[in-house]
């Protein structure tokens, strides 16, 4: 099947379940790879579309995806009167569950619905099935909960035949993405295949975090190394897991992108 550049109308059938914002290269016909971006908890696709435009990867079509469900106003500290108003705060989980230990939202709320929509419909049904791309043409980038989703989808891809809702299109998925970047997001246990004889996932991954990361501690890194063939870790000097704030923090991400764009 010949490859063609996706158009906005290719994704309209996903609405309102899934909404995307697309950022094309300056010359769309130069597109050779696709970057799919997942924002963090409580954000929206708009900010990550802007991020993609700012980094301006050559020959890369960026698709920033909106979280699958809105956050309740109460969790955002907003008055109940805003409950019926349009929101710009979304999340990726199947549910919103508070930890009994910390009172914070559980980092692994289950991602079955996001997996079905993003991997089953956006990636296989549209990018692969309709437009003729391969999974090794596709990079993933996520922050926080979105980073966990990026790692989880990369983990699940090694068992493509078992994926939830992956039924659209008539082309099979490959077993690895071109690469995946997670900032501050851990690999969700719910997205690790259950087979004890499973092979390691083939997607090269880069995880970036602060020195006092809440989720990407030594155990989380060990888990990644058990589940993926190629894991790179960047520990920033800053304490938290916020998005890159300067050239020094962004440099390893850009180097990873450059390497992966040269691959295959």
Tell me what each language-model feature is:
Residues 142-146, 150:
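Gly/Ala-rich beta-loop-alpha elbow adjacent to hydrolase catalytic centers
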Residues 50, 152-156:
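Active-site signature of alpha/beta-hydrolase-fold catalytic machinery across serine-
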Residues 2-135:
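Serine-hydrolase catalytic machinery in alpha/beta-hydrolase-like enzymes
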Residues 54, 156-160:
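Active-site catalytic microenvironments for nucleophilic, acid-base chemistry
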Residues 78-84, 159-173, 199:
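Intrinsically disordered, low-complexity domain-flanking/linker segments in eukaryotic proteins
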